[in-house]
């Protein structure tokens, strides 16, 4: 799944097995290391961000395909909450993940709310003064993560700036656990979830606060969106479906997950023009 193999190692595996070799890199572009996979003889490269697919395919002519992340229903499903669970996990807003500088700066904007940030303790060099009361300094995994997501009124999923067009694994895990997912908007969301019915996206800090204020007191509406999100995640976004599609693509029966339609400006000799990423083949037109 990650870029651990040297090009010569990929070539040797291919030679010894006689079978196709593929890589599914389930991380954003800032965590691609040395990009060694671009120099290795992979038969297929799968990425979760359609931006990476479009660049590597269009500019490098690499055999790249879109394969979004997903959920594991064995771990990501609604769980029953005991009274002690509710006392421990309940809050207005929660999230789970590494407390990096981007997330620390982001959550300063939510200092007025009851917030719990689950994850490893922050690094010693990080100033967390403004969000200290939010930091739980404890990772939650599997059933504990499901409890944290379901017990909170809102699960805020602020995406890394390096998630250019796609979304992260929590964007699937949160709704799968029947949590209310308030996620950073990205161009690829609309193809994966119905915004406003299965998840809710926000465009900036002001939009985030506006939607937090709107949804916090509206429990019935939140629960309805969370239930619809769970149904969609379990129906369309599981590892079984992703692996089936990956194998079909490797053996020529499919071409990865359909790319979203994204309009953007591109420079030309005459200035700029609007182009669209084609859903069927990933080409620009």
How would you label these PLM feature ranges?
Residues 1-9, 36, 40-195, 253, ...:
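Nucleotide-sugar donor-binding catalytic core of glycosyltransferases
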């Amino acid at each position: 799944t990650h870029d651990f193999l040297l090009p010569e190692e990929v070539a040797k595996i291919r030679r010894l097995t006689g079978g196709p070799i593929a890589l599914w890199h389930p991380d954003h572009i800032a965590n691609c290391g040395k990009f060694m996979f671009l120099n290795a003889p992979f038969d297929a490269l799968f990425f979760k961000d359609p931006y990476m697919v479009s660049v590597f395919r269009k500019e490098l002519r690499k055999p790249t395909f879109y394969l979004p992340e997903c959920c594991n229903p064995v771990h990501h499903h609604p769980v029953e909450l005991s009274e002690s669970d509710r006392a421990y996990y309940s809050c207005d807003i929660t999230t789970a993940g590494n407390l990096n500088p981007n997330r620390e700066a982001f959550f300063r904007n939510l200092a007025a709310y009851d917030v719990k940030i689950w994850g490893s303790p922050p690094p010693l060099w990080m100033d967390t003064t403004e969000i200290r009361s939010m930091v739980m300094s404890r990772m939650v995994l599997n059933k504990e993560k499901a409890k944290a997501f379901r017990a909170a009124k809102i699960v805020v999923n602020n995406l890394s700036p390096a998630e250019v067009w796609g979304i992260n694994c929590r964007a699937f895990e949160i709704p799968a656990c029947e949590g209310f997912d308030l996620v950073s908007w990205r161009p690829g969301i609309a193809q994966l979830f119905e915004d406003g019915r299965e998840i809710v996206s926000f465009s900036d800090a002001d939009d985030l606060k506006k939607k937090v204020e709107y949804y916090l007191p509206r429990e019935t509406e939140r629960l309805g969106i969370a239930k619809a999100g769970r149904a969609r995640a379990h129906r369309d976004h599981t590892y079984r479906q992703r692996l089936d599609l990956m194998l079909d693509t490797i053996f020529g029966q499919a071409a990865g997950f359909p790319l979203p339609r994204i309009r953007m400006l591109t420079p030309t000799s005459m200035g700029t023009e609007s182009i669209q990423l084609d859903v069927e083949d990933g080409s620009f037109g």
